[in-house]
From Swiss-Prot:
This is Large ribosomal subunit protein uL15. HAMAP family: Ribosomal_uL15 (MF_01341). GO terms for cellular component: cytosolic large ribosomal subunit. Binds to the 23S rRNA. It comes from Vesicomyosocius okutanii subsp. Calyptogena okutanii (strain HA).
Length: 144
């Protein structure tokens, strides 16, 4: 096998459709656009979602729910992630330093997921009931 003998598999490379090249081609003259009408004109296509003057689906259906702006600045950290840290005194800045949360996060909640095997002190961080019990079980503490 040489580089000059390599070729794509049969049917792998599809040639582009050449329109307007005579009636014998099957797509000559009107080029597959039919006769007259908006779709046959240059630039003549409706915008996406246009239903011929009927109220479009995205406007017929009601708006639903909302996106909380607090969720943008809120994140959660698991106990197993805290267990991997070397610090014993933990604040939000420690999480940012270890890339557990992004820099725009202002509120963090620790959730009970995984295990914690050493005592840590959490300050200024919200904690779920289960996570608080797990931290206090290994002689750790949580303070607001």
């Amino acid at each position: 096998m040489q580089l000059n003998t390599l070729s794509p598999a049969q049917g792998e490379k599809k040639s582009r459709k050449r329109v307007g090249r005579g009636i014998g081609s099957g797509i000559g003259k009107t080029c597959g656009s039919g006769h007259k009408g908006q779709k046959s004109r240059s630039g003549g296509f409706n915008k996406i979602g246009f239903e011929g003057g009927q109220m479009p689906l995205q406007r017929r259906l009601p708006k639903v729910g909302f996106s909380s702006r607090i969720s943008i600045i809120t994140s959660q950290v698991t106990l197993s992630e805290i267990n991997r840290l070397t610090e014993t005194y933990i604040t939000i800045d420690v999480f940012k330093a270890h890339n557990l949360i992004t820099k725009n996060i202002k509120r963090v909640k620790v959730i009970l997921s995984g295990e914690i095997t050493r005592a840590v002190t959490l300050t200024g961080i919200k904690v779920t009931k289960g996570a608080k019990l797990a931290i206090e079980a290994v002689k750790g503490s949580v303070s607001d």
